């Protein structure tokens, strides 16, 4: 095994020390050779790969966090059918709800009947999937700071010499640099906060943001100079539906404009005069300046600062971590109260023997998902001690009057749909009762209204109907896939879900089952 003469030349201690150093030298040589041959295994390389992997995961999560057409909208004139043939239908909704609340997919997966969910998206990937990163602007060149990775919207913040040419839907940024790098210096955005939905975005104009050198030819000259910033947004998409009016437009417009303190000009593309008029009271509080229907402008409007698009990160929620001073839905609701003169800030607190009657508003639906026994529900609620109001808001409803009526209530109740959006006018500590129809849409219903209610300081209850409470039982046998396997309809796409579970389903509440929900609401009103 070893040379005895060599061994006799050294003491046992020296032999051990020599052996130790020999092993150490051999180890160092082996590691050096290994690293030389396999540089990818260098510790720094491993660290770098880990960082790149994490960044890739984060980016992928952001790109996948797209919200699709939600089941709450009344499918009328503003609800667009599937945008194009060949649309992918692999998932109905994906939404980034942050770490503080479950995502839409998590919410849907919490429903054991919901084994498959579908999504209705354009075959052309939305900007979220096309973007590879958040743009890091070059201040020297005057590049915009663009965020194309948000879950719901894309936007660019621009500073410098900004010129808007409406007839080409182009925002020019004129750089002081003599030459611009040969690489493409243009960006595009559709300024509406539902970017993952092909049905919504098909009616939203695409705008180009183009960086040019000041000495280039054909740069438009300013005809109107403005000393205030501007915000570009679209009133296309699903505007006209109450849920989308707030989630896609009013909440993002509010949160995007707050930093300007009223000194900002709104530029509305895809301008709909009736829509702006409906919410004129809100716009007049957000800006001291007129709204420009930018598509019709022949003048070249110039600004030194602009936000092209709206900042929206969560469904029907303001993500406080993304805005200065902890801006939240609580601030937005205070804004609504002051605008519409909503007097009540807190719901009633019931006391034993107090003789008080909490007011309950039942949202009535005229066409789809109707409550066919509204009268019976109303009578039962009154026997339990409620004062009951049955109401239905339409396009012609006076918004101020209706907001004040909702604010006078302590409980808002209705079948899943856009009418529940009126919870924004409720006082704090009020209760939202959402009746969820058949169809495996529980998770979607919670994302639309259940999760946002928490940020609004509203208590939330839900009542999930059974097959015997659905009008579908009159159309299909109980062993039909409509009842046994809603996921099979999800696989067929949004049209199948809408047709069967939303357009053709009405609800007849089992009074015995539902009574406990109304009793629970009363108990909640006894404690604040």
How does the language model describe each region?
Residues 2-528:
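The feature primarily captures lumenal catalytic ectodomains
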């Amino acid at each position: 095994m070893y040379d005895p003469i060599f061994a006799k030349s050294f003491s046992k201690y020296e032999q051990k020390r020599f052996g130790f150093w020999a092993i150490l030298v051999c180890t160092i040589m082996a590691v050096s050779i290994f690293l030389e041959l396999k540089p990818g295994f260098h510790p720094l390389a491993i660290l770098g790969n880990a960082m790149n992997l994490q960044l890739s995961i984060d980016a992928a999560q952001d790109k996948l966090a797209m919200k699709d057409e939600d089941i709450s909208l009344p499918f009328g004139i503003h609800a667009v059918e599937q945008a194009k043939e060949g649309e992918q239908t692999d998932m109905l909704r994906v939404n980034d709800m942050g770490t503080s609340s479950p995502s839409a997919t998590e919410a849907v997966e919490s429903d054991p009947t919901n084994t498959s969910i579908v999504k209705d998206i354009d075959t052309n990937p939305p900007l979220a999937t096309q973007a590879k990163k958040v743009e890091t602007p070059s201040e020297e060149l005057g590049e915009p700071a663009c965020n194309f990775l948000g879950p719901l919207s894309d936007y660019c913040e621009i500073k410098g010499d900004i010129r808007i040419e409406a007839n080409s839907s182009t925002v020019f940024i004129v750089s002081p640099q003599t030459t611009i790098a040969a690489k493409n210096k243009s960006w595009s955005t559709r300024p509406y906060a539902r970017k993952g939905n092909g049905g919504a975005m098909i009616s939203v104009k695409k705008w180009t943001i183009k960086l040019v050198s000041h000495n280039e030819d054909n740069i438009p000259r300013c005809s109107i100079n403005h000393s205030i910033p501007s915000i570009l947004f679209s009133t296309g998409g699903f505007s006209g539906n109450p849920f989308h009016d707030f989630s896609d437009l009013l909440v993002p417009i509010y949160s995007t404009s707050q930093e300007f303190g009223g000194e900002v000009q709104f530029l509305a593309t895809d301008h709909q005069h009736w829509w702006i008029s409906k919410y004129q009271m809100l716009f007049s509080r957000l800006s001291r300046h007129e709204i420009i229907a930018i598509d019709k402008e022949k003048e070249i409007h110039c600004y030194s600062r602009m936000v092209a698009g709206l900042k929206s990160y969560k469904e029907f929620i303001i993500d406080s971590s993304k805005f200065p001073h902890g801006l939240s839905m609580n601030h937005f609701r205070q804004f609504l109260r002051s605008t519409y003169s909503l007097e009540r800030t807190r719901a009633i607190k019931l006391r034993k023997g107090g003789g008080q009657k909490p007011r309950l508003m039942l949202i009535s639906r005229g066409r789809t998902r109707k409550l066919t026994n509204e009268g019976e529900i109303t009578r039962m609620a009154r026997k339990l001690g409620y004062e009951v109001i049955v109401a239905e808001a339409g396009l012609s409803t006076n918004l101020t009057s209706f907001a004040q009526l909702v604010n006078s209530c302590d409980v808002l109740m209705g079948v899943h749909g856009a009418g529940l959006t009126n919870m924004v006018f409720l006082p704090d500590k009020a209760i939202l009762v959402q009746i969820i129809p058949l169809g495996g849409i529980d998770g979607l219903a919670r994302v639309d209204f259940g999760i946002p209610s928490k940020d609004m300081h509203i208590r939330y209850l839900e009542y999930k109907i059974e097959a015997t409470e659905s009008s579908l039982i009159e159309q299909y046998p109980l062993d039909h896939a409509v009842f046994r396997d809603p996921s099979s309809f999800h696989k067929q796409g949004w049209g199948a879900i809408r047709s069967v579970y939303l357009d053709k389903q009405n609800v007849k509440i089992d009074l015995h089952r539902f009574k406990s929900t109304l009793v629970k609401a009363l108990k909640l009103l006894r404690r604040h």
